[in-house]
Regions:
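Acidic, proline/glycine-rich low-complexity IDRs
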Residues: 155-162
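Short, solvent-exposed coil/turn linker segments
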Residues: 2, 7-11, 54, 72, ...
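Charged, amphipathic alpha-helical stretches
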Residues: 2-33
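Acidic, low-complexity, intrinsically disordered interaction modules
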Residues: 33-150
Length: 166
């Protein structure tokens, strides 16, 4: 697979089912995802032929499994799913990357509202450090999430081989 741009919905489809289940579980617990959760409820309701109100009565695990089985989602929903996954399950990797960049963070979350764009040499070193320490698909998913969230700050990641998902 080339390192051409990957949209969030495509990345979601490429994620293994077990990771999609983890992402969906984190997503349902994410208090900042109300808009995307409404979209997810409608998708699940259509898929299992339930009323949306009935979907909300399903347990978290069932909703997560149903959502993980939906491969055709919007970019907005897919991006939130991937971000929720990282916030819940990938904090050590996020922190390691920010440490390598010398960016202040709290458990993998950048403290500064407007982070400074890292210079090329620092970014190169941090990318290599992370790629050597974590599985390639995990690093690629994280870098794509950074690019979607803040392309101005993380634009230096574009075109790198570490973005390749396969």
């Amino acid at each position: 697979m080339s390192v051409e741009e990957i949209r969030p919905a495509r990345l979601w489809r490429l994620m293994p089912l077990e990771l999609r289940v983890e992402a969906a579980g984190a997503f349902w617990a994410d208090e900042q995802a109300a808009l995307e959760q409404a979209e997810a409820v409608a998708l699940i309701a259509r898929q299992i032929k339930f009323r949306p109100k009935s979907v909300l009565t399903l347990g978290l695990d069932k909703r997560a499994k149903h959502l993980a089985g939906v491969v055709q989602v919007s970019d907005l929903l897919a991006a939130r799913l991937v971000i929720s996954y990282h916030l819940e399950h990938q904090r050590p990797m996020m922190g390691a990357f920010l440490d390598a960049l010398g960016i202040a963070h709290e458990d993998g979350l950048i403290k500064d509202e407007s982070p400074v764009k890292p210079d090329d040499a620092t970014l190169d070193a941090a990318v290599k450090t992370l790629a050597a320490a974590y599985p390639k698909p995990a690093v690629a998913r994280y870098f794509w999430a950074l690019l979607w969230q803040d392309p101005e700050t993380w634009g230096g990641l574009k075109g790198r081989p570490e973005l390749a998902l396969e």
